[in-house]
Amino acid sequence: RYHNDVCHMMNGRTYQEEIDYIVTNEARNRFITKLTVDLKGNTLVMFQFVEKHGKVLVELIREAVEEGRKVFYVSGEVDASDREKIRGIVEKENDAIIVASLGTFSTGINIRNLHNIVFGTPSKSQVKVLQSIGRGLRQSDNGQVTKLYDIADDFHTKGYKNFTLKHSAERIKIYTKEGFRYKVYPIDLKGTQLPKDNDDAI
């Protein structure tokens, strides 16, 4: 949940304006970084935009992790053979982090030994990702459970519900349909800045 001033400023914004604000929000990116670093096990962080989000996230995460913890970056810029090498390495690790674009996993997440998935960018294409991973979020053959952290961005005001909040409701329908167990945790995102066309800051 964002500061009330931010919610009112975002009221009526286009979908692209909403996304641009979300992926460049420093407090949100810090939250994703802390969540990712604090998680135990192999963690996949997924993003949609390479330059303005993916590269920012991977740098923040690399700065925050303890020395020796492996952090990998995967986007369309990375050769398919290198992606396979990364996947093979991670399958042998127990505490690695992969920061990857949604496009590179649009046909499914094929990494065994994956403990956590973090959706870093709200995207309508996440529905396709959820459908493709299907059984991957259920208990695996060896008893391991993969946990998904889906960040829903709430800018709603009286009489207005923002795009990404509505999309998160669609994903929850999929969780219910697929039989996933889920919990909703409210997060008060402190220190969020106002959209750039406003001179004030919070």
Predicted feature descriptions by range:
Residues 1-7:
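Short amphipathic
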Residues 7-64:
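Conserved interdomain hinge at the start of the Helicase C-terminal
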Residues 19-25, 74-78, 95:
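Short, flexible loop segments at the rims of nucleotide/cofactor-binding pockets, characterized by
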Residues 40-41, 68-69, 94-95, 114:
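Short, high-confidence coil segments that cap the C-terminus of an alpha-helix
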Residues 42, 180-202:
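Long, largely alpha-helical accessory region at the distal end of helicase-like NTP-driven motors
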Residues 42, 70, 144-147:
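Residues at the starts of beta-strands that form the adenosine-phosphate
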Residues 44, 62-85:
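Conserved RecA-like helicase motor-core motifs
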Residues 76-181:
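Conserved RecA-like P-loop NTPase helicase motor core
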